[in-house]
Amino acid sequence: MNRNKRLFNVLTAGVLAAGMAASLSITGMEEESSVFPLAETTTLTGMISYPANTESDPNKRTIFKRLQDETNVEIQWTAIQADQWADKIALNMANISELTDFVFSAGFSDSDLLRYADQEVIIPLEDYIDSCMPNLSAVFEKYPEYRTMCTDVDGHIWALPWIEQLGSGKTAIQTVGNNMTYINKKWLDFLGLEIPTTVDEFKDVLIAFRDNAEKLQSEFGIEGSIIPMSFIMNDQDPCLLINGFGEGYGDPDTGRHIAVTDDLEVICTATQEGFKDGLAWMHELYEEGLIDPEAFTQDWSTYVSKGKSGRYGVCMSWDIANIDNLADWTVLPALTADTKNVTPQNGSFTGGFERGRCVVTAVAENPELVCQWLDLMYDPFQSPQNNWGTYGEDDDYDIFELSENAEGGKMLKHAPLGDASPIEVREAEFVGGPLAVLDDYYDVYVTCPDDAQYRLDWIEEYYTPDMNTEYVYPNVFMSQEDTEDLADVQDDITKTINAAKSDWVMNGVTDDQWEDFKDDLEAYGLSEALEIYQKYLDAYYAE
């Protein structure tokens, strides 16, 4: 047992004893005492993140106010701004005086979960799920793959998941992420241009945007220079543009840079010839002044600010409505280079999934009550609100109106947002945390969001037909040893690849640089990493 674990055990011994007694006493009570609302107000403690420039007190958000009224459970929150979360949550998890009963929006990686489990900072939840979490149990019963994805190699579940189904397989909304590529249809029409279908045609369109900058500025009242194409490298990423080069793998996984071949082999996308050739082509665009010079360093707010000024001809994002006027844009289909292909995002065939969304800590004096309260987040009527927002707000916009489904049951109907940005309204209302929104819920408990529906339609129309890849890397829960071994090498591998992407687009790449790059990745442990990924892929398909 390591020193940190011994120290934590000494500090928490008294708290754990009290917690065990409370848990045993709850179990022995009559059934109605554990049904909400509780007879007396009870206080639990939790940690949560919130988006910058939104309400910082969770208990002032309508969702949590309603939950307190319905349960008689008051939550004392430690609220941390989202852009400070990673640093502060790490410190809080290491300090018993800062720990709360649960961490609502943990967002922990597998490495985090297994480390905190080893230190006994968090508790296993599988028994609580089976005994007092009927909503989550129902999700696991209907979709057993999610329980499998939450369970470690020793059979423990250390966290409660976030699950969002919007489509399935190659039509799932997550198959194309922040790399969805949009082109300014208003500009195309004004200049008499067609939507490009090849990389050569695409370059010609960008040149036309550049060469007709003054006409575009005059016609549409644009202040500031015309930017033929912008993105945020390794975030709002241009990987779809190079998907057709070489073997057609592209590079959609900007965290791990892996893909799965049709022969079920895990490969590194960044060591394929198509990766090099695609970035060399993008260097040509950069040399022509067709790419925003800030695309490699800008943050989200800068990116959006320029987009809202109407300066972009092409850009990448989850939803163009967050950047510019939706009606002025259309999706850019896959471009033909050596081939034509769209590589889906890894893990996307089972929908949106986050294994480490919420944890219960060892300081919880009544973990059963904590789990009962958290199970309410998986109620089919509650989950959509936690995920997107709610109804009955006092401000200008609501995400939902309270309506009825075809059977007369209550249903959340998405409300019109006018010119408001969907992400801004959602951030003002939603609370996140553990939840499950399933395809079965649409038109029963909630309508499909308009912005999700048009995105689903776009994927099915423009991208699914060109998803020639049969497999994506699935969500797997590796052992602590393999997780640690990967963590030891993945960071250097990812940093090297991400840095090379920016460098090669700006400065080009020589054959010697390419060989040195591959040698560096091998020295960092690329082959060992691929072996670990392959082991779990083989096991996944052997089941």
Residue ranges of predicted features:
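Conserved small-residue motifs centered on glycine
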Residues: 380-503, 508
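Conserved N-terminal structural module of periplasmic/extracytoplasmic solute-binding proteins
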Residues: 2-10, 21-201, 213, 249-258, ...
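Helix-loop-helix "hinge/cap" segment bordering the ligand-binding cleft or interdomain interface
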Residues: 126-128, 154-238, 260-306, 360-394, ...
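General small-molecule cofactor/ligand-binding pocket signal
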Residues: 74-80, 294, 330-332
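Long, His/Glu/Asp-enriched segments that create or flank divalent metal/ion-associated functional microenvironments
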Residues: 65-66, 317-320, 445, 449
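Glycine-rich, aromatic-lined ligand/substrate-binding cores of catalytic
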Residues: 201, 278, 284-287, 303-320, ...
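Short, flexible loop/turn elements at secondary-structure junctions
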Residues: 48-52, 79-84, 93, 104-108, ...
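Carboxylate/His-rich catalytic cores and anion/metal-binding grooves
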Residues: 120-150, 206-210, 220-259, 310-326
